[in-house]
A protein has these predicted regions:
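Extended beta-strand/beta-hairpin segments
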Residues: 1-52, 56-146
C-alpha cells in the first residue's frame, strides 16, 4: 500500500504566526493562520483539509459499495462539516456531519442508505477519526432524469 505525505511549516507565535501546508503530490499548497483556523480569516486550516479528505474518502467508498451491488453511480457529491473548538486545555474535533447526494440509476432508497451507512462506518478516514464524538450522515438519493 502506498504511503502518502503532507507537510506543514509554522512561523511565529500561536496567535500572530502563519504557516503553509502542502500535499506531497503538489496538488495543493495553502496558507493558514490563527485567523483562518479560529475566526473567519482568509486561508485554510487543518480541519477544512480533514473535511475534504473525509468527504473524498466517503464518496469513493460509497461508489465502490454501490458498484459492487450492481449500481454504479453517475455522481456522488459529499460535503463534510467539521466542528472544532476548545476541549479542556486544548482543542478537539467534536463532530463531523457528512451530507451526501448521489445519482445512482436503478438503486432503491433502501440499498442506497445501507451502502451510505456502511461507507460512513468503514471508509479509511472515518476509521482514522474514531476518536471524534459524532460522525453523522445525511444521505439523499437523487432520481436520475431519463
Amino acid at each position: 500500500m502506498p504511503t502518502q505525505k503532507a507537510e506543514a511549516t509554522w512561523h511565529g507565535s500561536f496567535r500572530e504566526g502563519e504557516g503553509k501546508m502542502r500535499l506531497g503530490s503538489g496538488a495543493f499548497e495553502g496558507g493558514y493562520s490563527y485567523r483562518s483556523r479560529m475566526e473567519e480569516g482568509p486561508g485554510t486550516n487543518p480541519e477544512e483539509l480533514l473535511g475534504a479528505a473525509h468527504a473524498g474518502c466517503f464518496s469513493m467508498s460509497l461508489a465502490r459499495r454501490l458498484e459492487a451491488a450492481g449500481y454504479p453511480p453517475e455522481r456522488v457529491h459529499t460535503e463534510a462539516r467539521v466542528r472544532f473548538g476548545r476541549e479542556g486545555e486544548g482543542y478537539a474535533i467534536s463532530r463531523i456531519d457528512l451530507r451526501t447526494e448521489a445519482e445512482v440509476p436503478g438503486a432503491s432508497e433502501e440499498v442506497f442508505l445501507e451502502k451510505a451507512e456502511a461507507a460512513k462506518r468503514d471508509c479509511a478516514i472515518s476509521k482514522a477519526l474514531a476518536g471524534v464524538g459524532e460522525i453523522n450522515l445525511e444521505a439523499r438519493l437523487v432520481q436520475h432524469a431519463e
